[in-house]
C-alpha cells in the first residue's frame, strides 16, 4: 500500500460504490486487517441481497416491522428491499458518497449521520433498527457496543427491536480476544481503492456469547434467529420494559 493517498476511513468504499453506480461494473476494494489478514471486497455485494448472506438478509427483512432505521446502509440494498415491501425506512451512513449512491439508486430517505449521535427529535423513533452486512462492527469494541446500545434505547418505540448479523473470528484465541482479561476488542481495518488508502478504524467481530453478555447486562433480550454454516448469525435484541 506504499504511496497511496491517505483519506478518511470510509472514502475508498464510498468511491468504489459511486464508480459501480456510474459504470454498472463491480469495483474491488482491498482490505487489510491488523492481524495480517488481507482480502478483496467486490462492490457488487453492496448492491444486491443475493449472495453469501442472502438467507440472513431475507430473514431480517421478513422480521422487520413498523418504521425502520437502516444503520450503516452502504449502497442501500436493504433499504431498497424494504421500500419495495412498503416499509417506511430511513437509511443512514457516515459516508457522504454512500448516501449519494443510495439517493441515486432511489432510496427515498437517506442521510449522512453517525448512528452513535442520532437525535431522536430530528429522526424520530423506530420500531426496527437494522445493522446488516455485519455493520454492528462499527461499535469497534465491547465498550463501544455498550455505548451504542445505550444510545439506541431512546430511538426505539416500546416493543421495538434491533436486528443484527455478525460473526466471530476463528476460534477463542483469535487476535481480537485480549489474553489478559478475555475482553473481545476490535481489529483495525484499512480500506484501499484506486490509489487511496483510508485511515484505519476498529471493527468488532462479535460472537454470540459476547453479544449475549453485553446485551443481558444492559437489559436487552437476545434471540438468535438464524445461522449460516460458516458461523454468521442473525440476532434480535428486544428492549426490556420497566
Functional labels for PLM-detected ranges:
Residues 43, 47-67:
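Conserved alpha-helix/loop element of class I SAM-dependent methyltransferases that forms part
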Residues 72-76:
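Class I SAM-dependent methyltransferase "Motif I" SAM/SAH-binding loop
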Residues 106-117:
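Conserved SAM-binding strand-loop segment of SAM-dependent methyltransferases
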Residues 144-158:
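A short glycine-rich, Lys/Arg-flanked "PGG" loop and its adjoining helix->strand segment in the class I
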Residues 220-242:
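Core SAM-dependent methyltransferase catalytic element
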Amino acid at each position: 500500500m506504499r504511496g497511496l493517498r491517505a483519506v478518511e476511513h470510509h472514502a475508498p468504499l464510498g468511491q468504489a460504490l459511486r464508480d459501480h453506480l456510474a459504470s454498472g461494473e463491480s469495483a474491488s476494494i482491498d482490505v487489510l486487517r491488523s492481524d495480517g489478514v488481507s482480502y478483496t471486497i467486490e462492490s457488487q455485494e453492496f448492491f444486491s441481497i443475493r449472495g453469501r448472506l442472502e438467507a440472513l438478509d431475507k430473514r431480517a427483512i421478513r422480521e422487520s416491522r413498523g418504521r425502520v432505521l437502516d444503520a450503516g446502509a452502504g449502497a442501500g440494498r436493504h433499504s431498497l428491499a424494504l421500500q419495495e415491501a412498503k416499509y417506511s425506512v430511513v437509511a443512514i451512513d457516515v459516508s457522504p458518497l454512500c448516501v449519494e449512491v443510495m439517493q441515486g439508486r432511489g432510496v427515498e430517505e437517506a442521510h449522512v449521520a453517525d448512528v452513535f449521535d442520532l437525535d431522536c427529535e430530528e429522526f424520530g423513533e423506530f420500531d426496527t433498527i437494522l445493522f446488516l452486512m455485519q455493520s454492528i462492527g462499527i461499535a469497534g469494541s465491547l465498550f463501544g457496543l455498550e455505548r451504542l446500545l445505550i444510545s439506541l434505547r431512546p430511538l426505539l418505540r416500546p416493543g421495538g427491536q434491533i436486528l443484527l448479523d455478525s460473526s466471530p473470528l476463528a476460534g477463542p484465541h483469535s487476535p481480537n480476544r485480549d489474553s489478559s482479561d478475555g475482553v473481545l476488542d476490535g481489529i483495525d481495518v484499512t480500506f484501499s481503492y484506486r490509489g487511496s488508502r483510508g485511515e484505519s478504524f476498529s471493527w468488532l467481530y462479535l460472537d454470540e456469547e459476547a453479544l449475549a453478555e453485553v446485551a443481558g447486562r444492559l437489559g436487552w433480550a437476545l434471540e438468535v434467529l438464524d445461522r449460516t454454516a460458516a458461523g454468521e448469525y442473525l440476532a434480535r435484541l428486544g428492549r426490556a420494559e420497566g
